[in-house]
Amino acid sequence: SAAVSQLPGAVAVMDPFHVVHIAIDALEQCRQRVQQETLGHRGRKGDPLYAARKTLLTGTDILTDTSQARLDALFACPDHADVHATWRIYQDLLAAYRDRDPRRGKNTLHQLITTITRPDLPHTCIELARMGRTFKRRARDILAYFDHPHTSNGPTEAINGRLEHLRGIAQGFINHRNYRLRCLLHSGGFHHLLHP
């Protein structure tokens, strides 16, 4: 890519936001597939998988007793085995990133990637297999985060988001002064004048 050709010594790092998002997508797709296979329709208010969709995305360290009981009842059903396996991997991934010791977190995540990409593992859960292939392909980038902690393109994406928002609100302005005033108004440029 262009970045590699211009910065040959740079290390590619996949930040936790994007890695966890891959796991969340796999968990959601697995939940939706199992919902469709077991009940024959999309999630409805009284369906257990649909009712637990937000609880499934909550870390085990902050689950309430009620939420834990709901998950225990959900995973007691053998039809939900794929959801349980994907949820377990998701929780292990969160634990690896939340570990205060980067070396231990890296080892945990490396073992996780090795486990879900083992060839002898029966992949009945297609979402877990897909996530495993992605993690195996990007393993170096994922694990590099622990060697370069707090590496993220989040601040850059935040600035780009603000610029896109400003561009959107100022469309149609022909007068440059009005355009500039509108941008300052939305970006907080007048804050010190309005609230001295």
Task: Name the predicted role of every residue range.
Residues 1-7, 17-21, 40-196:
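Acidic/histidine-rich catalytic cores and adjacent linkers
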Residues 16-40:
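Short alpha-helix plus adjacent loop in nuclease-associated cores
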